[in-house]
Curated annotation (Swiss-Prot):
Pfam families: Ribosomal_L9_C, Ribosomal_L9_N
Species of origin: Thermus thermophilus (strain ATCC 27634 / DSM 579 / HB8)
Gene: rplI
Protein name per Swiss-Prot or TrEMBL: Large ribosomal subunit protein bL9
Biological process terms in GO annotation: translation
GO CC field: ribonucleoprotein complex; ribosome
Length: 148
């Protein structure tokens, strides 16, 4: 019996893949749990339409990421913080960087996609990687300076 997988299954395949399984496995396990649907003509057409729509969305996201890359790689974000000699009071997190970028340049980014292993705790220049799309990494220059 041919089915279209709706969820990735370890021993069968990935989402959208058409696989041949035993009828009992399909009727008693895959279909009732919503893990697959029968590979009928209409379901195959719906799958193709969904794949085309997903490809279009991915292309739009990549184009948006390319536009964002042009903006972000040509600027240096300056974040003023209260500080002593070299150490700052508190720390600068990915969320702080995203808020400062929005405030200073009007660009909104997702702080979860900013590669910051640990919060910044010293004054200085930093180059961080922001990944809005897997194929488009962006190098963001951040300068942490003492507040006057």
């Amino acid at each position: 019996m041919k089915v279209i997988l709706l969820e990735p299954l370890e021993n069968l395949g990935d989402v959208g893949q058409v696989v041949d399984v035993k009828p009992g496995y399909a009727r008693n396990y895959l279909l009732p749990r919503g893990l697959a649907v029968l590979a009928t003509e209409s379901n195959l057409k719906a799958l193709e339409a969904r794949i085309r729509a997903q490809a279009k969305r991915l292309a739009e996201r990549k184009a948006e990421a390319e536009r964002l890359k042009e903006i972000l790689e040509n600027l240096t974000l300056t974040i003023p913080v209260r500080a002593g000699e070299t150490k700052i009071y508190g720390s600068v997190t990915a969320k702080d960087i995203a808020e400062a970028l929005s405030r200073q340049h009007g660009v909104t980014i997702d702080p979860k996609r900013l590669a910051l292993e640990k919060p910044i705790k010293e004054l200085g220049e930093y180059v961080l990687t922001y990944k809005p799309h897997p194929e488009v990494p962006i190098q963001l220059k951040v300068s942490v300076v003492a507040q006057e």
